[in-house]
Structures are given as C-alpha cells and as structure tokens.
Amino acid sequence: MLKSVHQKVARRTGPLLAWLKLLWVRIDEDHMTTLAGNLAYVSLLSLVPFVAVIFALFAAFPMFSDVSVQLRHFVFANFMPATGDIIQRYIEQFVANSSKMTAVGALGLIVTSLLLMYAIDSALNTIWRSTRQRPKVYSFAVYWMILTLGPLLAGASLVISSYLLSLRWASGFNTMIDDVLRIFPLLLSWLSFWLLYSVVPTTRVPARDALIGSLVAALLFELGKKGFALYITMFPSYQLIYGVLAVIPILFLWVYWTWCIVLLGAEITVTLGDYRKLRQAAREEAESV
C-alpha cells in the first residue's frame, strides 16, 4: 500500500509532498486519533497512581527531596496549561490520600502505573508495525526504567536550572542564562520524546529519525501548550457550560491533544525510515531495468 502511494505521488510531486502524502496514509491506516483517545482514557485512569508512584520515588532519594516541590510546580506549569493550579490541588489531595494505603494498595498503584506503560508500548509498536514480543522480564525492566528515569531526569534538570539561576549574578551571563532557561522546557520535552521513540519500540529505530520526530513533537508540544491556554482563555465555553466541573473535560481534552502530538511524532519518525526505504527500492528497481 505505502509503496504504491509513494510511486503514484512521487511521479507528480516533489519529495516533500510525497513524504507528506506517505505520512497522511500512515496516520489514517494506524487510526492515530483513535489510539490517542485510548491512551487519553487510560492516562486519566492512571494519572493519580502514576503521580503517587513518582513522588514516592522522589521520597526514596534524599538528594531530590529539596526539588520535589519545585518539580510539582514545574510539571503543572509546563505540562498542564490553563487550569493547572486547580488540577494540581485535586491531584495532590488524591496523592495524599493514596499515601495512607496499605502495602496491597501501594502494589495496586504500581500495577496501574505499569498498565499505562503497557498501553503506551502497545500503541507505539502498532505505529511501528512491530510484532516482535519482548521477554516479560525485559518489558517490565523497560517500563520500570521509564517510570524511574523520567522523574530522576526531571529532578536533575531542576537541579541544573537552579544552578544556572544561581549564576545569574555573574556579569555578562544574565542574557545567556535567561535564553537557556527559556528553551529548557523544549529541550526536556525533546529528550523525553527521543527516549520514548528510541527505547519503547521493539524494532530498531534510527537515531537520526528519532531525533527529528522527537524535535517536531517537542516543538508542537510547546506550541500546543500556548495555543491550548489561549483557547481556554479566549473561548471559556467549558467554564460557562460545566461550571466547577469544567476542569474534567479540559483535562481530558489536554491529555488527548498531548497524545495526538506524541503519536504524530512517532508517525513522523517511522515515515522518515519508510520513505528512505521506498526511495532506495525505487532506485534499485530503476537500475535493474
């Protein structure tokens, strides 16, 4: 299917339009928006357990105890635009309640968080069309690595940003440090998406393709945050209709939009490799004739 689309489009248009057409066909065949909806639903069910596990991990590392509060503010300010304060207040209440649970309940939180990892794994491997199965132990190790490395990377990034802020007193460094801090969320998103696209698929992902796809996803994510906040501010229809409950559809809409961006970055990464293979096959076919 992809080969026939590439051949038809490549004859009539340039490489960029042929690649965009190939990308559109992949998005349609993979039902990307449906996958994003499924992940949004699972994410909302797993949100409180996931956050509870993350902050429990921070409590286990004394070196990050001082940045735990900063991390909360950073996450809600940079990853949940608009209504972030309200959502933060509710989630912190839920997490505080979850800390009173027994060992069995804590195990349930961890399992629920790992189920979110499994849903992400399934969605990305659907996009990569990979049917190879990992050993269960290896899959668990990958999920646990994402669950632990993610918070630790975020904590380390906050330590670095705090260090940069402490250097602002040095003359001549103010402008440069301000510029670095301004693009810091973008760099963190880029690194996170690159790790996601490189580690989770069960097939080999070229590093260059993953870097390009993750960069596009990170840029769209940063623009999406500003656009979503602007939409909520300029068109407050959800607040008018739902009142106090407006936070629920707003949160779901933002999570869905975020997963659309994540999966689009994955589709871009895959399509770069597919397009390169199709061009190589077309070149070899032309040489054989």
From Swiss-Prot:
It is a multi-pass membrane protein. Pfam families: Virul_fac_BrkB. InterPro entries: UPF0761_bac, Virul_fac_BrkB. It is found in: Cell inner membrane. GO terms for cellular component: plasma membrane. Its main location: membrane. The chain crosses the membrane at residues 44-64, 104-124, 140-160, 183-203, 215-235, 244-264. Keywords: Cell inner membrane, Cell membrane, Membrane, Transmembrane, Transmembrane helix. NCBIfam families: PRK01637.1, yihY_not_rbn. Belongs to the UPF0761 family. HAMAP family: UPF0761. This is UPF0761 membrane protein ESA_04062. It comes from Cronobacter sakazakii (strain ATCC BAA-894) (Enterobacter sakazakii). The lineage of its organism: Bacteria, Pseudomonadati, Pseudomonadota, Gammaproteobacteria, Enterobacterales.
